[in-house]
Curated annotation (Swiss-Prot):
It comes from the Bacteria. It comes from Saccharophagus degradans (strain 2-40 / ATCC 43961 / DSM 17024). One of its GO terms (cellular component) is cytoplasm. One of its GO terms (biological process) is protein transport. The gene is secB. Keywords: Chaperone, Cytoplasm, Protein transport, Translocation, Transport. This is Protein-export protein SecB. InterPro entries: SecB, SecB-like_sf. SUPFAM superfamilies: SecB-like (SSF54611).
Length: 168
């Protein structure tokens, strides 16, 4: 693998292009929210906790080689059927430098590698918020961002194909 990278970088240098590279410039919490809608009543709720998780990624181009990637995760913990114990929302962001990667490969790096780097920060923040809020720790499961990306690409292709058929 390292021979392949070296060969690709040497070829890029011979063509006058910068060698392919990826780096983290900064990781930061962009937005944070913790809510206990039931107030004090949340601590007397009965039932089995049900943890719901919603996530999405936002990609913003900063300049020619830098991108801001924001991983937005909302965790809602309900007791029983519909009684919300608490809601935590974290927007974890990173500034990433990407050089020599373009097109679909760039989109894949920004949609998979960057969120994979940011997710441990989100997990720790949500767990800490829950504990500091007086609740049991919340241990979010690991997420396969590669599989989510493949699924999103397949859905977009299927949607484009069905739109093309409808237009024909």
């Amino acid at each position: 693998m390292s021979e392949e990278n070296t060969t690709n970088n040497e070829a890029a240098a011979a063509e006058g292009k910068a060698p392919a590279g990826f780096g983290i410039k900064r990781v930061f919490t962009k937005d944070l929210s913790f809510e206990v809608p039931a107030g004090l009543g949340a601590f007397s709720l009965q039932g089995q906790p049900n943890v719901g998780q919603d996530l999405n990624t936002q990609i913003n181009r900063v300049d020619d080689t830098h991108y801001e990637v924001v991983l937005k995760v909302t965790v809602t913990v309900k007791m029983g059927e519909d009684k919300v114990a608490f809601l935590a929302e974290v927007h974890q962001a990173g500034i990433f430098q990407v050089v020599g990667i373009e097109g679909p490969q760039l989109q894949q790096v920004l949609s998979t590698a960057c969120p994979q780097i940011l997710f441990p920060y989100v997990r720790e923040t949500i767990d800490s918020l829950a504990v500091r809020g007086g609740f049991a720790p919340v241990l979010l499961p690991q997420i396969n961002f590669d599989a989510l990306f493949v699924q999103a690409v397949a859905q977009a292709k299927a949607q484009a194909d069905s739109q093309a058929e409808a237009d024909a």
